[in-house]
Amino acid sequence: MAGTEISAITTKLLEAKKAKGITFADLEQLLGRDEVWIAAVIYRQASASVDEAEKLLHCLGLSDDLVPELTAPSVKGLGPVVPTDPLIYRFYEIMQVYGMPMKEVIHEKFGDGIMSAIDFTLDIEKEADPKGDRVKVTMNGKFLPYKKW
Protein backbone atom coordinates (compact mmCIF):
# COMPACT_ATOMS: atom_id res chain seq x y z
CA MET A 1 0.00 0.00 0.00
CA ALA A 2 1.46 3.30 -1.03
CA GLY A 3 2.21 5.61 1.88
CA THR A 4 1.46 2.98 4.51
CA GLU A 5 3.99 1.18 6.69
CA ILE A 6 3.12 -2.52 6.57
CA SER A 7 4.71 -4.71 9.24
CA ALA A 8 6.65 -7.85 8.38
CA ILE A 9 4.00 -10.05 10.02
CA THR A 10 1.23 -8.37 8.00
CA THR A 11 3.18 -8.96 4.80
CA LYS A 12 3.72 -12.60 5.77
CA LEU A 13 0.02 -13.12 6.58
CA LEU A 14 -1.16 -11.44 3.37
CA GLU A 15 1.29 -13.43 1.25
CA ALA A 16 0.07 -16.69 2.85
CA LYS A 17 -3.57 -15.66 2.31
CA LYS A 18 -2.85 -14.93 -1.36
CA ALA A 19 -0.90 -18.17 -1.84
CA LYS A 20 -3.81 -20.16 -0.39
CA GLY A 21 -6.34 -18.26 -2.54
CA ILE A 22 -8.39 -17.47 0.58
CA THR A 23 -10.63 -14.40 0.85
CA PHE A 24 -11.50 -12.54 4.04
CA ALA A 25 -15.04 -13.91 3.59
CA ASP A 26 -13.56 -17.44 3.55
CA LEU A 27 -11.68 -16.68 6.77
CA GLU A 28 -14.91 -15.35 8.31
CA GLN A 29 -16.55 -18.74 7.67
CA LEU A 30 -13.55 -20.68 8.96
CA LEU A 31 -12.94 -18.58 12.09
CA GLY A 32 -16.45 -17.47 13.01
CA ARG A 33 -15.38 -13.80 13.18
CA ASP A 34 -16.32 -10.92 10.87
CA GLU A 35 -14.14 -10.46 7.79
CA VAL A 36 -13.37 -6.81 8.65
CA TRP A 37 -12.23 -7.79 12.17
CA ILE A 38 -10.01 -10.53 10.70
CA ALA A 39 -8.48 -8.01 8.27
CA ALA A 40 -7.87 -5.68 11.24
CA VAL A 41 -5.99 -8.48 13.04
CA ILE A 42 -3.90 -9.15 9.94
CA TYR A 43 -3.08 -5.43 9.64
CA ARG A 44 -2.29 -5.40 13.41
CA GLN A 45 -5.12 -2.98 14.21
CA ALA A 46 -6.83 -5.53 16.49
CA SER A 47 -5.60 -8.29 18.79
CA ALA A 48 -6.67 -11.93 18.61
CA SER A 49 -7.03 -14.43 21.45
CA VAL A 50 -4.57 -17.32 21.46
CA ASP A 51 -7.26 -19.62 20.04
CA GLU A 52 -8.19 -17.12 17.28
CA ALA A 53 -4.53 -16.57 16.38
CA GLU A 54 -3.86 -20.31 16.20
CA LYS A 55 -6.92 -20.87 13.99
CA LEU A 56 -5.95 -18.01 11.67
CA LEU A 57 -2.38 -19.24 11.34
CA HIS A 58 -3.59 -22.80 10.72
CA CYS A 59 -5.97 -21.58 7.96
CA LEU A 60 -3.06 -19.75 6.33
CA GLY A 61 -0.64 -22.68 6.73
CA LEU A 62 1.67 -20.73 9.03
CA SER A 63 3.37 -21.84 12.25
CA ASP A 64 2.21 -20.98 15.76
CA ASP A 65 5.40 -19.00 16.44
CA LEU A 66 3.46 -15.91 15.28
CA VAL A 67 0.79 -16.30 17.99
CA PRO A 68 2.47 -13.92 20.49
CA GLU A 69 2.57 -11.11 17.94
CA LEU A 70 -1.08 -11.58 16.94
CA THR A 71 -2.23 -11.61 20.57
CA ALA A 72 -0.20 -8.60 21.73
CA PRO A 73 -2.00 -5.26 22.11
CA SER A 74 -1.81 -3.54 18.74
CA VAL A 75 -0.73 -0.01 17.89
CA LYS A 76 -3.74 1.60 16.23
CA GLY A 77 -3.54 3.78 13.14
CA LEU A 78 -1.84 3.19 9.81
CA GLY A 79 -0.43 5.59 7.29
CA PRO A 80 -0.11 9.35 7.06
CA VAL A 81 -2.57 11.78 8.66
CA VAL A 82 -4.03 12.55 5.23
CA PRO A 83 -4.25 9.19 3.47
CA THR A 84 -2.80 8.87 -0.01
CA ASP A 85 -4.49 5.62 -1.07
CA PRO A 86 -7.51 6.65 -3.21
CA LEU A 87 -10.04 4.35 -1.54
CA ILE A 88 -8.95 5.27 1.99
CA TYR A 89 -8.84 8.95 1.02
CA ARG A 90 -12.55 8.77 0.04
CA PHE A 91 -13.40 7.93 3.66
CA TYR A 92 -11.25 10.85 4.82
CA GLU A 93 -13.08 13.06 2.30
CA ILE A 94 -16.47 11.75 3.51
CA MET A 95 -15.55 12.76 7.07
CA GLN A 96 -14.32 16.16 5.87
CA VAL A 97 -17.66 16.80 4.12
CA TYR A 98 -20.13 14.95 6.36
CA GLY A 99 -18.29 14.76 9.70
CA MET A 100 -19.83 17.85 11.30
CA PRO A 101 -23.32 17.14 9.90
CA MET A 102 -23.11 13.57 11.26
CA LYS A 103 -21.95 14.90 14.64
CA GLU A 104 -24.87 17.32 14.84
CA VAL A 105 -27.45 14.68 13.91
CA ILE A 106 -25.96 12.26 16.47
CA HIS A 107 -26.10 14.97 19.15
CA GLU A 108 -29.73 15.76 18.28
CA LYS A 109 -30.70 12.10 18.56
CA PHE A 110 -28.53 11.03 21.52
CA GLY A 111 -27.26 14.12 23.34
CA ASP A 112 -23.69 15.24 24.00
CA GLY A 113 -21.31 12.31 23.56
CA ILE A 114 -19.44 10.15 21.10
CA MET A 115 -19.78 6.88 19.22
CA SER A 116 -17.49 4.18 20.56
CA ALA A 117 -14.87 2.69 18.27
CA ILE A 118 -14.24 0.02 20.92
CA ASP A 119 -17.80 -1.30 21.39
CA PHE A 120 -18.13 -1.17 17.61
CA THR A 121 -18.77 -3.23 14.49
CA LEU A 122 -18.17 -2.38 10.86
CA ASP A 123 -19.81 -4.30 8.03
CA ILE A 124 -19.10 -4.03 4.31
CA GLU A 125 -21.61 -5.33 1.79
CA LYS A 126 -21.85 -5.36 -1.98
CA GLU A 127 -25.21 -4.20 -3.35
CA ALA A 128 -26.06 -4.97 -6.96
CA ASP A 129 -27.32 -1.94 -8.86
CA PRO A 130 -28.08 -1.70 -12.60
CA LYS A 131 -26.12 1.58 -12.70
CA GLY A 132 -23.06 -0.04 -11.07
CA ASP A 133 -22.46 -2.09 -7.94
CA ARG A 134 -22.60 -0.14 -4.69
CA VAL A 135 -20.48 -0.36 -1.54
CA LYS A 136 -22.56 -0.40 1.66
CA VAL A 137 -20.61 0.41 4.83
CA THR A 138 -22.40 0.13 8.16
CA MET A 139 -20.73 1.50 11.30
CA ASN A 140 -22.42 0.45 14.54
CA GLY A 141 -20.98 1.88 17.76
CA LYS A 142 -22.27 2.23 21.29
CA PHE A 143 -23.20 5.80 22.22
CA LEU A 144 -21.10 7.11 25.10
CA PRO A 145 -22.47 10.25 26.77
CA TYR A 146 -19.97 12.66 28.26
CA LYS A 147 -19.84 12.36 32.04
CA LYS A 148 -20.65 15.34 34.18
CA TRP A 149 -18.93 15.77 37.54
From Swiss-Prot:
CDD domains in the record: Cyanase_C
Protein name: Cyanate hydratase
GN (gene name): cynS
E.C. no: 4.2.1.104
Keyword Lyase: yes
Known catalytic reactions: cyanate + hydrogencarbonate + 3 H(+) = NH4(+) + 2 CO2
A Gene Ontology BP annotation from the UniProt entry: cyanate metabolic process
NCBIfam families referenced in this protein's UniProt entry, alphabetically: cynS (TIGR00673), PRK02866.1 (NF002773)
Keyword Oxidoreductase applies: no
Enzyme class: lyase
Pfam families the record matches: Cyanate_lyase (PF02560)
Catalytic machinery residues: 90, 93, 116
